[in-house]
């Protein structure tokens, strides 16, 4: 029961940090733009929803590994990730280019 509370707390903190990035930082939403940001070495952190298709997920992880960028697997589906971003559409993956006022890049250890 304590573990569930801890995951909920971290989930909420990730959501609040994401909201801060959306307000003050630079980011790209979507598969194609995430790959573009990785190819041009602009992305600092990649966040992927847990229902992202396996082939797409592995391709993003591969590009992130080449660019030495952290990948965070978001604990929620693409609808949840879209809501956390403050959007009214689904978001499968997003790339944080500039965190702005948020400390999301330091706080989330990328799963290398």
Swiss-Prot record:
Gene3D superfamilies on file: 3.30.1330.30
Listed GO CC annotations: ribonucleoprotein complex; ribosome
PROSITE patterns per record: RIBOSOMAL_L30E_2
Keywords: Ribonucleoprotein, Ribosomal protein
SUPFAM superfamilies, sorted: L30e-like
Signal peptide boundaries: none
Gene Ontology MF annotations: RNA binding
Family annotation (Pfam families): Ribosomal_L7Ae
NCBIfam families according to UniProt: PRK01018.1
The family this protein is said to belong to: Belongs to the eukaryotic ribosomal protein eL30 family.
Name listed for the protein in its UniProt record: Large ribosomal subunit protein eL30
């Amino acid at each position: 029961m304590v573990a569930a509370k801890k995951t909920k707390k971290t989930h909420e903190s990730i959501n609040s940090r994401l909201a801060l990035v959306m307000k003050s930082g630079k980011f790209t939403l979507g598969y194609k733009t995430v790959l573009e940001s990785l190819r041009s070495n602009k992305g600092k952190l990649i966040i992927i929803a847990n229902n992202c298709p396996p082939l797409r997920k592995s391709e993003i992880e591969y590009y992130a590994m080449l660019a030495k960028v952290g990948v965070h697997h978001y604990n929620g589906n693409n609808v949840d990730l879209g809501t956390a971003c403050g959007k009214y559409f689904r978001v499968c993956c997003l790339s944080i280019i500039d965190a702005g006022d948020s400390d999301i890049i330091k706080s989330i250890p990328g799963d290398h």
